[in-house]
Amino acid sequence: MRIDNTLSLPMPPDAAWALLLDIPYIAPCLPGTQLTATIDDRRYQGTVSLRLGPIALTFEGEAEITDIDEAARRVTVRAQGRENRGRGSAHADVSFQVCERDGGTEVAVSTDLTLAG
């Protein structure tokens, strides 16, 4: 499934770009996300809890920054995990694109999400 979102930030694009690359700083801004370990400067372990209708799921896994394009202000993250009750798995490729908009910043977020189990 593909999910596309945008968000507006009242700051210059360069400042937003710097924050976007600080995963421990921005992780608490992502609903249901909790970092549990930093493996290195591009890989992190954590949990993501979400609801799909009446179903509540918590996935434990790893996220890795797979590409950083400084010139385009685009970063790509690959995340994968297993549901903590062992019933399923999730895999997501997420790209964040930072652009200047109306004196502030717009961040376009594109997610390709696969759930199994």
Protein language model annotation of sequence segments:
Residues 6-10, 49-51, 64, 97-99, ...:
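Generic structural detector for well-ordered beta-strands
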Residues 67, 81-117:
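Beta-strand/loop substructures that line and gate deep hydrophobic ligand-binding cavities in soluble
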